[in-house]
Amino acid sequence: ADYGAPVVLFSGGEPLVREDLEELIAYADDAGIRPVLSTNGTLITEQRARSLRDAGLKYAGVSVDGLPERNDEFRGVEGAFDGAVRGIENCLDAGLKTGLRYTITERNAADLEGVVDLLTDVGVDRFCFYHLDYGGRGTEIVDADLSPADRRRAVQRVCDMTRAYHDRGEEIET
């Protein structure tokens, strides 16, 4: 806080494996720094969502990288998609601002609209789209990165999707 940092992002690996996460969130919040979370969502039970909220968490960004089969394949865990959606629902039920984190690759670009439609039905209204980071697990799938032309098309699809929701009177943040 003394250095003017407005936000601290707790991310991974998976930050929810830390038993002291709520303590760290409360410390940041008490110091005037906005604590936010980046997670795969699978460890967010109803009780954990309330605990995170009570500690002062301001936002949970849950990573979903495709529709169920593609997401589970990417995550290497069967049921990861369903676990992420349950985590999202638990956060929303606890009153936490919650959004989607989606890394667009050649392998999951076709799922963009389907994932947004599905999670909008759950109550998500914030969608953050990312390009592939060549660090961590991204080093294993560098070949799945979008070409510049495909990236432009994906961005255009996100813009078109946002406009379509707006035109229907539904506001989403992208």
Which residues does each PLM region occupy?
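Radical SAM enzyme [4Fe-4S]-AdoMet core and its adjacent flexible, acidic
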Residues: D54-A55, Y59, S63-D65, R70-T174
